[in-house]
Amino acid sequence: MPVVRVLRRVACWMLQSPACGCRAPVLPSRFLGTSPRQIPMDANFHSTSFSEADQQRVLITGGLGQLGVGLASFLRKRFGKDNVILSDIRKPPEHVFLSGPFIYSDILDYKNLREIVVNNRITWLFHYSALLSAVGEANVSLARAVNITGLHNVLDVAAEHGLRLFVPSTIGAFGPTSPRNPTPDLCIQRPRTIYGVSKVHAELMGEYYYYRYGLDFRCLRYPGIISADSQPGGGTTDYAVQIFHEAVKNGRFECNLKPDTRLPMMYIDDCLRATLEVMEAPAESLSMRTYNISAMSFTPEELAQEVLKHVPELQVTYNVDPVRQAIADSWPMNFDDSNARKDWGWKHDFDLPELVTTMLNFHGSESRVAQAN
């Protein structure tokens, strides 16, 4: 027994000795398989150091949403096909399944998420699992579970395993009392949707984990994202995607927002590039953990006028959805993204004319292929 006591003292001395360069972290009790989920006061996690030249191992949660598939394709060009794992709780379409690694991942299942990170040696995690604004209002309890409880699981796994974590935020993180034109990075945030509330929660929790545990948390507040190869997913800005589908398909479009509703928008290529750029930015260049990013700002009427230059036969009508309109009226009209441009060199490529041309070219080509088939 004296030998055991001596060995125990030596082990404790080694763990706390300055010679080892760090103090061994005390893991949250949940990491040890116990309950309740409580983080001790002296816990201290620091992201595993790695050279930027090292090959990243990437996990994307909520990968079958509007942005996940495009992000996976974009990152695979940078890190290699097999180093970017797409995940979701739904069965992927065949083309997604064949394009690279795909696995089942339920962010509400902490053990499952932890096993994926460990078994695949994940270093970067992009957390896209969320219920969007309009869908969230229709199912608040589910939105609360996915957007908040799921986030807690992701934060804990990322902290435990020293990951670099990206969590997208949104224009929906602001509310009617926020300055709207422009909206700065730091101002009052009192959103009126469960989606917005959950995103403010994510921003603050990520920042807390950064300061408290050393988690390398990075976040961008996305404007409305417009993408050619995905269907609208229940967001308030979906009209700006749907108009292109309808213009090419049947020449008629009914908008559910007022014609003068101005919101910040961005083409998906700019969005994906900004996401990678902020993740690759040197830590010392980041003055904050959450940044606004923007590219353009327009109204449904301005978008329709630009589309009409290419599709003059398009008929646009307005049938305002009061729920979505109320949400849009509480959101920023313009984003101030000067900090992102100053700190890590953000610069957008697509303005409204380029956006419209690109979207119509894509859907026009898609329509011609369908007709040929």
From Swiss-Prot:
Record localization: Mitochondrion
**Which parts of the sequence bind NAD(+)?**
62-67, 88-90, 106-107, 195, 199, 225
* SUPFAM superfamilies associated with the record: NAD(P)-binding Rossmann-fold domains
InterPro entries for this protein: Epimerase_deHydtase, NAD(P)-bd_dom_sf, NAD(P)_epim/dehydratase
Cytoplasm keyword on record: no
Q: In which pathway does it act?
A: Amino-acid degradation; L-threonine degradation via oxydo-reductase pathway; glycine from L-threonine: step 1/2
Give GO terms for biological process.
Answer: L-threonine catabolic process to glycine; threonine catabolic process
Q: Where is the active site?
A: 195
Q: What is its main location?
A: mitochondrion
Q: List cellular component terms (GO).
A: mitochondrion
Q: What is its EC number?
A: 1.1.1.103
Q: MF terms per GO, please?
A: identical protein binding; L-threonine 3-dehydrogenase activity
Member of which family? Belongs to the NAD(P)-dependent epimerase/dehydratase family.
Q: How does it assemble?
A: Homodimer.
State the function annotated in the UniProt record.
Catalyzes the NAD(+)-dependent oxidation of L-threonine to 2-amino-3-ketobutyrate, mediating L-threonine catabolism.
UniProt name for this protein = L-threonine 3-dehydrogenase, mitochondrial
